């Protein structure tokens, strides 16, 4: 049986394999561009403009830094990139994630690990840090 196509061509020209992502195929410009166009909560927010995942990511990093003023640049970057996989898989709401089951979480985990490695961050984040984000 032939393996289905599971990659996406990014604006940078990189080809990101969604099932086996390589840190070498992750570019910050692709992440920033993608997250700017992804609306939180499927666009179900009040206001004239959608609330983007990019804006949310900046807010989370800012709050994390305010709560943890002595945090390192490394942990602030982890906070900023906490939803980075959504640049290619979108901002799926939790009820849908739960309905899909563990396959979605595995996909998301592989993407965040590749993203972290690409930017010199630990692939796995300590529970204490993750809970603060």
Locate predicted features.
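Metal-dependent phosphohydrolase cores
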Residues: 1-133
